[in-house]
C-alpha cells in the first residue's frame, strides 16, 4: 500500500445479517452496490453478540461493545458482565463505594436517590443491578431511598415497562426500602445530542418535583400514557406519589453502566461550567455515584472504575507513525473515538477527528438519510486529500432508524447507505485505496417481533458482515468475530498485531501463482 492510498474501515451501525428476509429492511431495500459486492468480493460473517464480545451468553450486541471490540482486537469483559459477576460472587454487596455512601446518609439522616433505566435490556443498564442495590440497602437497614425510573421501549419492546414494574414491585415487597417517586422515558432522560430541551424537564422533576402530571403510582401513569398512544421511550417526566425531590446533603446513584447516554444528565448536577439551560436550583450533593466512569471530567464517585486497555488499533497505528481519521455523525461520534480507543479519552498522535452534526429531528424515521450525505462528502474530501493512511468511519442510519421500528423509513435509510458506499468506493478506487466494511451489531435486519406482536426496535444477536473491497486479498476463515477485525486490518497494512490482540488475522494476500 503506497503512503497515501487510504484504507477505510467503514462500520455500518446496526447492519446485521439475517437469511430470513421477512421483516428484514436490508433484504427489502434496493442495494445494487451492496449486492454486487456480496456476489463478487471476499466476505464472511462475524459474531457480534454474547461471549465473543465479552457479554453474557446470547446477550445482543450493542454499539459501545461492538466498537470496543473492533478497536481492541481482544475479548474485553464488559461492565455488564463485570457487575453481574460481582452480584453473583458477593463482591457487589461488599462494594466499598456503596457502603461509604449509605453509612454517610445514615449519619446525616439524608436520602439516597437511585436513578437509571429500568430495563432487562442489558444495553445501558439492567434492572437486576437495581434489585441488588435494594437488597444491599435492606441488608444495611437503610430505608430512605427514592427511585427515579427511566423507561426503555428501545432496547426492549415499545410497551414493556409494566413487566419490569411487576418485577420491581416483587423486589420491593422483599426489600421494602424504597418508593417510586418519578418515571420518565429515556427519550428525555438519556439524550446524548445536547438537546437540552429534553433534559431540562427531567432535571426540574428531579430537583424541584416539577411535572405536568402526577399519578398515585407508576402503573396508573403508564396505563394513562399507553391509552394516549405514548410508549415507554416517550413517557414525559412524571411525578409519582408524594414529591421527594433531591435536596442538599442527599446522594444520587445513577445505576446505568453505559456512559454515552448517562453523561448529559450527570453533567447537569456536576459540570461547573454547565450552560445547557438555566438551573433554578442546584442541590449540594454529598455524593454522586455512577455505576461506571461516565467521563473523566465528570467527577462522580465510581463504583466500578475502568480497566485500562493498551495497544488498541488506534494506538498501534499511531506508534507505527501512521495518520488516522475518525469520522461519524454526532450520534456515533463517541463510538469511533472514545469506545474505539478502549474507553480512553485521549487522542493519539496523528489521530484526527471529524464530527458531522446529526439532524435535529424528534425521531430519525422523519429523516432516514440522517447526515449520511454530508458525512460522505466529508469522507470523500478526506480520501482525496491523501492525508490519512487509515480512515475509520461510522454510518449510523441502519441502527438509529431501525430503533424507531418504522420499516419503510429503515428501508430508505439502507438505500441511502448503498448510494453513499458506492460514492466512497469510487473515491477510494481513484486514489488506489482499499475498503473494509463491517458492522458493530444487528438491528435493521429484524424489524418486527412475532413473539410480542410489536415492532422490533432493539438490537439483534445476528452475525454481521465483514467484506473486503480492493482486490489482491482473500479470507482464510469462513467465519470470525469482531475481535478479528483489528488484526486483519493491520495485516493489510503489513503490520504484525501486538500480543495483546488475541483476534485472528482473517485475510491473506493472493499468491501470484495460485
UniProtKB/Swiss-Prot annotation:
Mn(2+) 2 binds at residues 13, 63, 440-441. InterPro entries: Alkaline_phosphatase_core_sf (IPR017850), BPG-indep_PGM_N (IPR011258), Metalloenzyme (IPR006124), PGAM_B_sf (IPR036646), Pgm_bpd_ind (IPR005995). GO terms for biological process: glucose catabolic process; glycolytic process. Binds 2 manganese ions per subunit. Mn(2+) 1 binds at residues 399, 403, 459. Catalyzes the interconversion of 2-phosphoglycerate and 3-phosphoglycerate. GO terms for molecular function: manganese ion binding; phosphoglycerate mutase activity. It comes from Legionella pneumophila (strain Lens). The lineage of its organism: Bacteria, Pseudomonadati, Pseudomonadota, Gammaproteobacteria, Legionellales. This is 2,3-bisphosphoglycerate-independent phosphoglycerate mutase. The gene is gpmI. Keywords: Glycolysis, Isomerase, Manganese, Metal-binding.
Amino acid at each position: 500500500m503506497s503512503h497515501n492510498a487510504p484504507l477505510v474501515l467503514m462500520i455500518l451501525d446496526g447492519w446485521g445479517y439475517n437469511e430470513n428476509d421477512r421483516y428484514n429492511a436490508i433484504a427489502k431495500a434496493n442495494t445494487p452496490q451492496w449486492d454486487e459486492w456480496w456476489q463478487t468480493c471476499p466476505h464472511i460473517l462475524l459474531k457480534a453478540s454474547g461471549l465473543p464480545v465479552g457479554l453474557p451468553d446470547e446477550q445482543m450486541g450493542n454499539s459501545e461493545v461492538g466498537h470496543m471490540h473492533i478497536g481492541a482486537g481482544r475479548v474485553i469483559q464488559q461492565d455488564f458482565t463485570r457487575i453481574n459477576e460481582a452480584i453473583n460472587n458477593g463482591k457487589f454487596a461488599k462494594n466499598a463505594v456503596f457502603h461509604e455512601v449509605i453509612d454517610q446518609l445514615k449519619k446525616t439522616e439524608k436520602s439516597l436517590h437511585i436513578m437509571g433505566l429500568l430495563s432487562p435490556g442489558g444495553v445501558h443498564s439492567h434492572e437486576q443491578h437495581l434489585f441488588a442495590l435494594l437488597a444491599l440497602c435492606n441488608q444495611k437497614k437503610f430505608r430512605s431511598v427514592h427511585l427515579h425510573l427511566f423507561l426503555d421501549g428501545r432496547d426492549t419492546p415499545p410497551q414493556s415497562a409494566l413487566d419490569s414494574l411487576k418485577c420491581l414491585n416483587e423486589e420491593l415487597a422483599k426489600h421494602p426500602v424504597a418508593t417510586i417517586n418519578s418515571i420518565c422515558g429515556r427519550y428525555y432522560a438519556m439524550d446524548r445530542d445536547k438537546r437540552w430541551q429534553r433534559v431540562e424537564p427531567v432535571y426540574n422533576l428531579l430537583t424541584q418535583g416539577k411535572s405536568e402530571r402526577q399519578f398515585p403510582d407508576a402503573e396508573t401513569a403508564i396505563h394513562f400514557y399507553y391509552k394516549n398512544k405514548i410508549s415507554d421511550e416517550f413517557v414525559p417526566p412524571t411525578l409519582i406519589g408524594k414529591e421527594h425531590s433531591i435536596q442538599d446533603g442527599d446522594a444520587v446513584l445513577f445505576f446505568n453502566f453505559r456512559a454515552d447516554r448517562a453523561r448529559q444528565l450527570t453533567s447537569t448536577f456536576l459540570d461547573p461550567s454547565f450552560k445547557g439551560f438555566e438551573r433554578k436550583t442546584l442541590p449540594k450533593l454529598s455524593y454522586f455515584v455512577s455505576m461506571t466512569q461516565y467521563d473523566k471530567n465528570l467527577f462522580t464517585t465510581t463504583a466500578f472504575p475502568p480497566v485500562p486497555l493498551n495497544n488498541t488499533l488506534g494506538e498501534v497505528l499511531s506508534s507505527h507513525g501512521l495518520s488516522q481519521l475518525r469520522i461519524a455523525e454526532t450520534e456515533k461520534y463517541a463510538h469511533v473515538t472514545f469506545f474505539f480507543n478502549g474507553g480512553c479519552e485521549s487522542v493519539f498522535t496523528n489521530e484526527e477527528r471529524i464530527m458531522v452534526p446529526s439532524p435535529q429531528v424528534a425521531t430519525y424515521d422523519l429523516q432516514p438519510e440522517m447526515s449520511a450525505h454530508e458525512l460522505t462528502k466529508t469522507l470523500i474530501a478526506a480520501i482525496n486529500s491523501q492525508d490519512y493512511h487509515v480512515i475509520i468511519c461510522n454510518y449510523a442510519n441502519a441502527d438509529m432508524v431501525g430503533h424507531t421500528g418504522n420499516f419503510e423509513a429503515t428501508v430508505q435509510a439502507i438505500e441511502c447507505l448503498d448510494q453513499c458506499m458506492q460514492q466512497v468506493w469510487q473515491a477510494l478506487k481513484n486514489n488506489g485505496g482499499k475498503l473494509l466494511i463491517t458492522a458493530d451489531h444487528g438491528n435493521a435486519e429484524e424489524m418486527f417481533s412475532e413473539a410480542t406482536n410489536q415492532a422490533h426496535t432493539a438490537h439483534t444477536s445476528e452475525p454481521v458482515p465483514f467484506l473486503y473491497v480492493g482486490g489482491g486479498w482473500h479470507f482464510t476463515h469462513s467465519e470470525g468475530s469482531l475481535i478479528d477485525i483489528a488484526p486483519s486490518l493491520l495485516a493489510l497494512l503489513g503490520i504484525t498485531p501486538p500480543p495483546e490482540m488475541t483476534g485472528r488475522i482473517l485475510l491473506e494476500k493472493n499468491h501470484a501463482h495460485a
